[in-house]
Amino acid sequence: MTKQKIAVLGPGSWGTALAQVLNDNGHEVRLWGNVVEQIEEINTNHTNQRYFKDITLDSKIKAYTNLEEAINNVDSILFVVPTKVTRLVAKQVANLLKHKVVLMHASKGLEPGTHERLSTILEEEISEQYRSDIVVVSGPSHAEEAIVRDITLITAASKDIEAAKYVQKLFSNHYFRLYTNTDVVGVETAGALKNIIAVGAGALHGLGYGDNAKAAIITRGLAEITRLGVQLGADPLTFSGLSGVGDLIVTGTSVHSRNWRAGDALGRGEKLEDIEKNMGMVIEGISTTKVAYEIAQNLNVYMPITEAIYKSIYEGANIKDSILDMMSNEFRSENEWH
């Protein structure tokens, strides 16, 4: 692939890691953020200490606070901003974009209030005149591992397979590999909902439960993610792939996962506001729990784990009691998809 110009919007841990992958592939990478000190640090010291204490970035990665400069004459734009500000940033991009680009996002969440997936937000806010079909970049990927060039396999999903193939080539190298998929609904739903299950898995650990319980919540969590995804129009096979079970494993079993760590702290009795303050990073699973619970209620989809986490976070229920209550739920077949 010839050298591309790419704007990466969001200099968080994942945005920074993806910027480095793209830079390793010989592309011109422009990293955009709105914290002046952070942008100056990246440009001057080639570090992003808030997220990576011991990593030096390539000096060719340039950071910007001016969005217009960052997206000027680029071939593609990658959104890696928190879910809650995706629409705001998309509106800003729409007002500045003067040419057609390949539009990608690598965030995982559902918009509070509207319940919309992030690709839908981008479609609504940025005219088709100036973008490709949205490409979703998602899968089992800790930024802490990708940044040190550990082997990572994820998915590029788009309704337009050619756009997905473009992104596949854009990112893939000897340590980072993408597979294509056309099931955007499934890939985005899996990526968002696995954060809820990761909170639950972390809570089990914090409560002192063992591997049996953790395996149970991950497996049954996958079942309810699939149930809701299918109701939303997803292909059930997607949930057995990288963006489904793969992402669920990596997020639901690792201390690298901020959602798992948040659940662990909840299980140990810490208050949510203290957890969010101490972590200093967005915990997407918290807001996604509320959105997923509301969608499940509207569609009458059975999601007992999501409901238990919701009641613990938003209704003040005891996390241990909420989890144990699931053990007395009505008996069901393992393969019920409704």
Swiss-Prot record:
Gene Ontology CC annotations of this record: cytosol
Gene Ontology MF: a single term: NAD binding
Pathway per the UniProt entry: Membrane lipid metabolism; glycerophospholipid metabolism
Binding site for sn-glycerol 3-phosphate: K108, G139, S141, K194, D247, S257, R258, N259
Binding, NADPH: S13, W14, K108, A143, R258, V282, E284
Active site: K194 (proton acceptor)
Cellular localisation: Cytoplasm
Single GO biological process annotation from the record: glycerol-3-phosphate biosynthetic process
UniProt cross-references to InterPro entries, sorted A to Z: 6-PGluconate_DH-like_C_sf (IPR008927), 6PGD_dom2 (IPR013328), G3P_DH_NAD-dep (IPR006168), G3P_DH_NAD-dep_C (IPR006109), G3P_DH_NAD-dep_N (IPR011128), NAD(P)-bd_dom_sf (IPR036291)
Main function: Catalyzes the reduction of the glycolytic intermediate dihydroxyacetone phosphate (DHAP) to sn-glycerol 3-phosphate (G3P), the key precursor for phospholipid synthesis.
Sequence similarity: Belongs to the NAD-dependent glycerol-3-phosphate dehydrogenase family.
Protein name: Glycerol-3-phosphate dehydrogenase [NAD(P)+]
Species of the source: Streptococcus agalactiae serotype V (strain ATCC BAA-611 / 2603 V/R)
